[in-house]
């Protein structure tokens, strides 16, 4: 019999927002879209030119499968990771792996920790947070998942004391989507010490580290090598690094040899590697166009300041000051449009329907991104939030 074999209600928050947005457009509304975190416009010209040259190359390797290596772009993964770090990683202590972006490997991490054969407890930063790690955990029948506590009270940084006994894998995401919080060297050091002492594998999704606006922002890779017993890995991507590289699907992992070896085994059975010409373009920009990358970072920082000031003037309350990326996170008003607000979803859907402002509701919070030109949208945004007449308490 034909029909879905999946349980009902499996769509995540992004699917809900896209559906509501589509319905509003169908009604003829003009939208002020601050929802999905995808940069506008093209990738950096330096990346596009290098990718174009690679596509036109006669080198057979540039047009072939790359698998878990990158023969067309020699030493890509080490070079890509190293360009994100303040100092080189110790030779012989780590291994590298090219990836087609971070999202495709999130579901492989529990498998690399043995969840196909035995029970594994996985902790994630998904409440609030990017939902895909939790979504993948739900697909793995031997995984027990829990979300680490993240809120304004702990500044969206969990503590080692929050980690449940028998946890086998922790999947962190710093800088954090959606709060914009960063991890510091000292914070990572305390977490690494705990994981090493309790035999917990540790992974960090560092997708937004290239857009850090705070000098304290650190990568796991800066600290983890201090702990020889720690099994760890970290992933980086070109998606937001080179302007709009979201469709390029290029990145790299680094980590302890044991964890990367397990990831190579699992990943090697699920894909044939990234698209080499796009990798050639990404590494050319990363190594040769830091000015262009810095310009995008400065643009987002300027837009963050503009949007937070505008929304605060309209009565909205920040959950935390963003220190990286291009997101702002807000406390949900208890009143708007002359009535009580039941939830973040209620407020977001009502804002879309009443004003055309599109955000993303994450649990008790609301996320508004600055990928769009918020300066051009500012008058309309201010009018929309003033129309809402938000209140708290």
Set out the residue ranges of the language-model regions.
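Conserved glycine-rich beta-strand-loop-beta hairpin in the small C-terminal domain of fold type I
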Residues: 283, 298-308, 318-335, 362-365
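PLP-dependent enzyme catalytic core of the Aspartate aminotransferase-like
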Residues: 89-90, 228, 340-341, 349-393
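Generic structural signal for small/hydrophobic residues in well-ordered secondary structure
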Residues: 17, 34, 51, 80, ...
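N-terminal small-domain helix-loop-helix segment of the aminotransferase-like
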Residues: 2-3, 7-101, 288, 391-393
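Helix C-cap/helix->beta junction micro-motif
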Residues: 24-27, 140, 197-198, 314, ...
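Hydrophobic beta-strand scaffold residues
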Residues: 31, 144-145, 202, 318, ...
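Conserved core of the PLP fold type I
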Residues: 62-195, 209-227, 233-234
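Conserved core segment of the aminotransferase class I/II
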Residues: 51, 225-301, 305-311
